[in-house]
From Swiss-Prot:
Site (Important for catalysis): 141, 190
Family: Belongs to the isocitrate and isopropylmalate dehydrogenases family.
GO cellular component: cytosol
EC supergroup of this enzyme: oxidoreductase
GO molecular function: 3-isopropylmalate dehydrogenase activity; magnesium ion binding; NAD binding
Catalytic activity reported: (2R,3S)-3-isopropylmalate + NAD(+) = 4-methyl-2-oxopentanoate + CO2 + NADH
Subcellular locations according to the entry: Cytoplasm
Positions contributing to NAD(+) binding: 77-88, 287-298
Cofactor note: Binds 1 Mg(2+) or Mn(2+) ion per subunit.
SUPFAM superfamilies listed in its UniProt record: Isocitrate/Isopropylmalate dehydrogenase-like
Name used for this protein in its record: 3-isopropylmalate dehydrogenase
NCBIfam families per the UniProt record, alphabetical: leuB
Gene designation per UniProt: LEU2
Annotated organism of origin: Diutina rugosa (Yeast)
Record flagged with keyword Endoplasmic reticulum: no
Amino acid sequence: MSKSIVLLPGDHVGTEVVAEAVKVLKAIERTTPGTSFSFSTHLIGGAAIDATGVPLPDEALEAAKASDAVLLGAVGGPKWGTGDVRPEQGLLKIRKELGLYANLRPCSFASSKLVDLSPLKREIVEGTDFVVVRELVGGIYFGERKEDDGSGVASDTETYSVPEVERITRMAAFLALQHNPPQTVWSLDKANVLASSRLWRKTVTRVMTEEFPTVPFQHQLIDSAAMILVQKPTKLNGVVLTSNMFGDIISDEASVIPGSLGLLPSASLASLPDTNTAFGLYEPCHGSAPDLPAGKVNPLACILSAAMMLRLSLDNAAAADRIEQAVREVIDSGVATADLGGSSSTGEVGDAIVKALEK
């Protein structure tokens, strides 16, 4: 049975990287008996504003809701400024409408050849391998806020409920259980100061102890974790569990470790991938890079996002493994875009991965 994938290329380099990911998915289709994908392309972001006046047309949203998974490129750019209608609103809306409560961002090296590209020393970062699991729909970003009304005071409220923390904790624990032995879950909070963090810590402890007794877990204060991330990131290997704002910050800090945003995939999930068919939206961590000339963007983050999609939403872990192996082979062969020290174009990197899959 064919798996339906909605493509949302978005703006600028988003269109290029999604095209390369589709090229790779079609190679998987050709080389894997019984595997079939149906693609449907829709507008989001600035491209949608230009064509329809809104950053997420109803047609795109309805198509996404009816699909098995969504692959997104990137949205935004200076052309659309910071007015009332902005490209980023399309991304926020689709996350909310699709119920995407968990954001997963791996931090590892696609090839050992890339370790020396890290801004940190090889002996510090070698072996780094964790995934940040960020709660995506609660916390301070969605809390009550009060703008300065002339009084010189403004406020934002951090609120978490037990069910919200339970849900994201189960996601982290489930991902830890996919390894043998189970990986450690590192829960980050600020329980020495914040009431919301004390609820977070208490709830994480109960869920892990009662529901996942075989999964080791540790609590870590967010400021301490931020230091560990630059001192010895391998100490956090496993699954890093965080609230919305802390996850936003720590995942961006982690993203510089592998040396290029062009390498980093992400997933946003609406349910546990316990049957490998969780609905999700997949996208590279990099932005739309409006200043980058055509053919220069690194497509690997989007291609690796497609691999995550195969593993978590489309029940095809074997194909995901093949893509990740092909990416490793291509990097090791020296075919790479400029951000990785190479001279290959976007399309040449995609073609090389297709060739590796078809050999």
